[in-house]
Structure formats: C-alpha cells, structure tokens
C-alpha cells in the first residue's frame, strides 16, 4: 500500500483529556477519531490493526470448533425480560422503542438472543454439543466513558456460546476455549495471565479472566511466586491463620476520641500501629430490619464480593443506612464496634489470633482500647472478608502471593443453567426425556485488546506493535521520493520485491519533510523500517531498523529484501 493512496492523519500532541498512553497514542497516530463521549470512528490505520486481531481470533475459534454467525445489535426486550435481566442490568442497558412502541435494547451481550435461537433449532441430544460465536459491535451506556476505547460505550467484541447435554461436556468445551484464548493472546504477542474470577452480572459458576499485564490496568491480580495459581484480587481467598491466639495483656478501657471518625485519624490520635485497629462495616441482613456487623483489620481492604456471599447477608450487598445504624448501635459510623451489639457479627480471619484491639465503643467520639474477642464480646464467626495482600500464603498452599495490575481482555464462564432454565432451552435425551441444556459463554474485547497491547508496548516515540497486530509489517521511508529519481526507483523496486515475497508493506510516498516521515513511522509503530536516501544509496546501502530496538544499521541494497523477509519469518 502506498501512503498517497491510503490515509495517514497524525498529531504532534494528544488531547488534554487523554490519560492513558493507549488513548494518547491512538489519537496521535490517527487510529481512532472521537465522535462523542465513548464513541469512536476506527480510521483506516486503526481498522487494519482491528482486523489483524479479528483474523487471529477467527482462526483459533475455528480450531476450537466454534461456528461463526452474526446476531443483531438491536435486541427485543421480551428476551431480556424472560431471562430477568431487563431490570437487573440497570442503566447500562440502552433501551429504545420502535415506531410501533415496542421495546428494544442495544445489546451489551447476546446470551438471550443465542438461547432463543438454540431452543428453536436444537431439540435432541444428537445435535449437541454446539458452539457458536460472532464478532459484533456492542453497546453499554457507561456512566463515565474514559480511557479511550478501553472503556467506551460502543466496542467490538467476540462472544461465543456453547450448549451441552451435560456438565461434563460443558467442562470439556470450557477447557478447549480456555486453551484457545491462551493461543490467541500468545499469538498476538501479549504478556498475559489467566486468572480465576468472579462471575459478576453474567452469572454462572466457574469463571476465568485473561489479564494483559500493565501498570495502567484497573484490575489487580494475585499470583503465587511458586505455583501457577492466579486470581483476580476480588476472588483470591485468604486462609485462616495458624497457631494460638495471642494472650490478652490489656484491660478494656474506653477512651475519649473527639471527632475521630476514620482509621487514619484514630491511628494519629492514639499513636498506635494501624495493625492494632479494627474497622466496623455494617450491612443489611436478609431479614427486614436486621443489621450485620463485619470486622476487619484497619490496614486491610474490605472485599464486598466475599461479604455478599456470607450466610444471612442481603444480596446485592447493601450498606446499612445511618438512621438504622444509630437505632441499633446508639452511635454513628466511625465509633462502632461489637461490644453490646446483639446481632450477627463476622470477623475476618486476620483478626482471629490477635489481642488487645482498638475499636469503636458504640458511643460517638469514644473508642475502646484493649478489646479482646470472647472476653469483651462474644466470639464472632471468623470468615474471609478482605482482599489479599502481598506476602499472604497462596491459597493452593504453595508459596506466597504477589500482586500485579492487569487489563481484562477476555473472560470465560460456565453459565450452567442460569439462562437455559429461565428461557426453557431444553432437549430430549437418549431416553426421550426433556432436559435443560448446560451453557457456557466466552468473550474477548477486540477493541480493548488493541488498547491493552499499546499499554504494554510503547515508548516515548510512540507505539511498538507486536508482529501479529501491526497495521503493516514494513514501512519504507524514502527521502525526497517526489524529487529524487534514484530514491524513487530504489524505493519502488524494494517495495515491489517485498510485496512479491508476501510482506505487508507501506511505502510512505507522501510529500513531507524527512522529520515528519521518520517521526510518523516511529509513532505508528510499524515493526520494520527501511529508510532510503541519496547519500546512503551512493554507497550502495539503505538504512534498516526494527522498531522495538530502534538501532539503525546500513544494509546493502541488494540484501535488504532477504534481510527483512528473514526477520518476518523468524
């Protein structure tokens, strides 16, 4: 492709609102253009990258036995009402009416649509298992779109759905798709980790995320320094502490702590280690008017996903109102504790072996020092309430945990019968008896993969594309292409020979200054660059550099095609 026939639109500066490297570089490199908040046009250069990702995904989906179809973006409300997600999904689901006043939505996922298709088309165990996928535009009305295509309202996603006669069959396909995802992200050249994950609003049982490792990632993953264990921090369990509880050394003393409402201010006021404090979180129970007290160490981070799964806790997790707290505890938040509280109390595992805690006294502006479980209040039920921290024992018993940030680019779920039961997706088994199908779903955020790859592969000059994702494999940068016959002839010859060798080549024949052409080639991140100029040609050479190391070297003009093709095929 010649640049004069293509479209290249680069910027020297990124817009002020762009925070992430990927957002800045995608705008500067002209991969995307913003149309509105969270809405982008994929420009020709960006679309080539998107298509490269899609091609890898399609090849691996076919290898895994998934069949491609294409479902609609606009979906009828009755399917979502049937599954129960019409109301549950909330405002992220963009709802609309047609001219006949019928309700529809812009699909953020397609579980309902594919379930409806399958229940109409498959009725026998002989037709199972089946695995379908499509690559389609999705829409989620994000309350605050940000970070470019990383969290846009409109995005491209590959979602696959499998249907099975039994759970064993689902597990087999789940593993096949898990393996396919590993191959996809490996082929794309990304550093990633599959991690055990929460199922979230999709539902079901087993679930894994595929996280591209990047310091800018919104997610935190925990992994063992010894084994293959890895999980999203939301799911990684903490283990009960071993050994005996420390002996109580202090008496229970009520201390006046005026205007002390936070753990940090308590630590400063009493000049104590934060590890000796307990913080109180009050949530609603399943029964009307019931409150449940949750206790964890002051330096630990509360995990609401774990808390929501506790017996007796209302789902979804609901924090108690200030009025309800005052009514049952006699104090406001910031001064709460278990002493005198008659309701259910859960305490985190990390508090079980400790003694002489500092905790709220259930009286405004007062705390207790020297608090001990069993002596000053009934023994709570010790459970897992917190996020893991670095150095915690790995849940598999092998090694210690480390933490890293990641960007979720893929997610696989064992949905089981969450949707098939609600929508009566059934089949006749080999005994002629009607059974509900087992279901799995498997998603990859195609547009997010592009942004995540840039987060992982960039420098101060621009993008550094991996081999599989680059919009072009090679860029030829001729100096004075329009004015120098020698340069033009050499550039055209190398261009033709590389095309004949099967390379994906961009010949930048734009009438621009040398500095613009060179800067654009680095900004665009094309892996291999050949610079052709009159001075080097007089010595029989061209300049060759790989974008990842940017070390330019003189290569004989008669050897450059072989040199580049060898690198491409390595």
UniProtKB/Swiss-Prot annotation:
MF terms per GO, please?
aminoacyl-tRNA deacylase activity; ATP binding; proline-tRNA ligase activity
Query: EC number(s) in its UniProt entry?
Result: 6.1.1.15
Report the main location listed first in the record. Answer: cytoplasm
Keyword Nucleotide-binding carried by entry:
yes
Query: Which keywords appear in this protein's UniProt record, sorted alphabetically?
Result: Aminoacyl-tRNA synthetase, ATP-binding, Cytoplasm, Ligase, Nucleotide-binding, Protein biosynthesis
Where it sits in the cell: the answer is: Cytoplasm
Show the PROSITE patterns listed in the entry.
AA_TRNA_LIGASE_II
Entry comment, domain topic:
Consists of three domains: the N-terminal catalytic domain, the editing domain and the C-terminal anticodon-binding domain.
Oligomeric state and partners? Homodimer.
Write out the function statement from the record. Catalyzes the attachment of proline to tRNA(Pro) in a two-step reaction: proline is first activated by ATP to form Pro-AMP and then transferred to the acceptor end of tRNA(Pro). As ProRS can inadvertently accommodate and process non-cognate amino acids such as alanine and cysteine, to avoid such errors it has two additional distinct editing activities against alanine. One activity is designated as 'pretransfer' editing and involves the tRNA(Pro)-independent hydrolysis of activated Ala-AMP.
Protein family (similarity comment):
Belongs to the class-II aminoacyl-tRNA synthetase family. ProS type 1 subfamily.
Protein name (Swiss-Prot/TrEMBL):
Proline--tRNA ligase
Q: What organism is the protein native to?
A: Neisseria meningitidis serogroup B (strain ATCC BAA-335 / MC58)
